Amino acid sequence: MVDYHMHSVLSDGKNSYEEMVLMAIEKGLDEIGFTDHVCLKPVTWAIRLEDIPVMTSQIIDLKEKYEDQIKIRYGIEMDYLPGKEEQINDIIERIPVDYVIGSIHFIGDWNFDTDQSFYGKWTNDKLYEKYFTLVQQAAKSGLFDIIGHIDIIKKFRVYPESNQDLLFEDTIKIIKANNLVVELNTGGMDRPCAEFTPGYKILEMCYKHHVPVTLSSDAHSNIQIARHFESAIELLAQVGYTEIVGFKNRIRRIIRL
C-alpha cells in the first residue's frame, strides 16, 4: 500500500523525513511520497524556497538508504495561485520530483484553510463556486499530476445551500480531460468535517468519469501515516475502484488494491 501525501519539519510537519520513513516501514507500507508545502505566498507553513535543495538532498539520501525496505517518492504539495503559473512552473522544473500535488488553500489573499474569519462574506453557494473554479483552473494549468483534497472547502463544516452536483461534475470532467489524478485524502476524518476528501459523492463522480485516484493520509506527524486507510480502502471498493495509481518521474503506474 502507498501513502502519497505527508509533511515533514521542513514545512508544517512534526517529524523528520527519516522518522516518517521508519514509521511507514513499521506500518508495513510498500511506498510513500513526501509532499512538503511549497507556496509563492509568504506563509509560515511552507518550506522556504531557499531550503528546497536541502529537501532534495535529504529525500534522495533516504531513497538510497532504505531502497531495500520501502519505495520513497519525491513529491511536493504546490499551492495553485492564478496568474502565477510561470513562477510555479519555474519552481517545479528545478526539483527532481516524482509527482506534484496541486492544492487550493487561498481564495484571493484569504487562506480559508486556517482563517475562519471570512466565512460568511459570501453565500456558501458562491464560496463553493469560487473554490471549485480555482480547482478547475489548477487542473487546466498543466502544472500538476494530482489534485489535492479536492473538496477541502468543507473543512469547517461549511456546505452549500443548494445542490452543487453540476459544479462538482463539471470539475471532475475537467480533471479527466486534463489527465489528472484525484487523491483520496483521509486527513479529513480528523478535521472538523470528519469526512474523507473527497467524500462519497465526488468520489463516485470520479469513478463514473474514469478519473484515477491515489491514497494519502496528509500526515503531519509520523503517527498519522496511513490513518483511516482501512476505511478508505473499503470506500474505494464500495464505489467500484479496484486499483489506485503511483508515480515515478511523473509517470503513472497502476497499483492493485
Identify the residue ranges that each predicted region occupies.
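Hydrophobic alpha-helical segments and helix pairs
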Residues: 78-120
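Acidic (Asp/Glu)-rich catalytic clusters
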Residues: 25-26, 56-69, 89-98, 137-143, ...
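Short, acidic/polar
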Residues: 13-23, 83-91, 129-140
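An N-terminally biased module of ancient metal coordination in phosphate/nucleic-acid-related enzymes
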Residues: 1-82, 94-96, 154-166, 170-171, ...
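Domain-core and long-helix interface of multi-subunit machines
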Residues: 10-11, 102-209
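Conserved active-site loop/cleft motifs that coordinate metal ions or position small ligands
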Residues: 183, 213-218, 243-247
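Hydrophobic residues within beta-strands of alpha/beta enzymes
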Residues: 32-34, 100, 147, 182, ...
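Short, basic/aromatic-enriched C-terminal tail that caps enzymatic domains
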Residues: 236, 240-257
